[in-house]
UniProtKB/Swiss-Prot annotation:
It catalyses: a menaquinone + succinate = a menaquinol + fumarate. The keyword Cell membrane applies. GO terms for molecular function: 2 iron, 2 sulfur cluster binding; 3 iron, 4 sulfur cluster binding; 4 iron, 4 sulfur cluster binding; electron transfer activity; metal ion binding; oxidoreductase activity. [4Fe-4S] cluster binds at residues 151, 154, 157, 218. Binds 1 [2Fe-2S] cluster. Binds 1 [3Fe-4S] cluster. Its cofactor is [2Fe-2S] cluster; [3Fe-4S] cluster; [4Fe-4S] cluster. This is Fumarate reductase iron-sulfur subunit. [3Fe-4S] cluster binds at residues 161, 208, 214. Part of an enzyme complex containing three subunits: a flavoprotein (frdA), an iron-sulfur protein (frdB), and diheme cytochrome b (frdC). It comes from Wolinella succinogenes (strain ATCC 29543 / DSM 1740 / CCUG 13145 / JCM 31913 / LMG 7466 / NCTC 11488 / FDC 602W). Keywords: 2Fe-2S, 3Fe-4S, 4Fe-4S, Cell inner membrane, Cell membrane, Electron transport, Iron, Iron-sulfur, Membrane, Metal-binding, Oxidoreductase, Respiratory chain, Transport, Tricarboxylic acid cycle. [2Fe-2S] cluster binds at residues 57, 62, 65, 77. Residues 142-171 form the 4Fe-4S ferredoxin-type domain.
Amino acid sequence: MGRMLTIRVFKYDPQSAVSKPHFQEYKIEEAPSMTIFIVLNMIRETYDPDLNFDFVCRAGICGSCGMMINGRPSLACRTLTKDFEDGVITLLPLPAFKLIKDLSVDTGNWFNGMSQRVESWIHAQKEHDISKLEERIEPEVAQEVFELDRCIECGCCIAACGTKIMREDFVGAAGLNRVVRFMIDPHDERTDEDYYELIGDDDGVFGCMTLLACHDVCPKNLPLQSKIAYLRRKMVSVN
């Protein structure tokens, strides 16, 4: 028999006039290799079919199951219960995003708005002919672009960001990472001055306080620390 876990889950439906924010406590018997995602499924299947949380892939790829796990933004599907020695686990929705219900938040609209704000697409003067082979680039450059493209938009870096909590319009590490991704892509013809117009202010790269919680919590281990520093140096050199 496994040990008994105490799971405290935040419950609240902002669309309901009678719902009030509160914690609901559940006792779950731990199983080998149990994840928080498995725990939440057990709770929903056994105790609370009304519990809301998001998931798709269950493999750390889609980023849907981001939530606060004992105060740390993490993916439920990649967090093992055995890592919590006292067996007490508190789950809350990610801050900085609109709450849908319980542990479910709207990251989609935020990331869509961020993508539009930083103009997250290739800017080129000539029209691309899709019938021709794509222009070749050096393998090292392609690998660097791919590395930054691994962002799964889970929202963990945004939830961990002190600046984002204080400044609603801050683009966050995800936005700054997206800018660097296009900055190093040789297919994009924008200049440093063009990027400065997008993120050269306190809601962009100069709002970052370099606390680097984003770097610490990123489930894909993206090089956020070095890329934000690179972007800051680039933007400082513009003026």
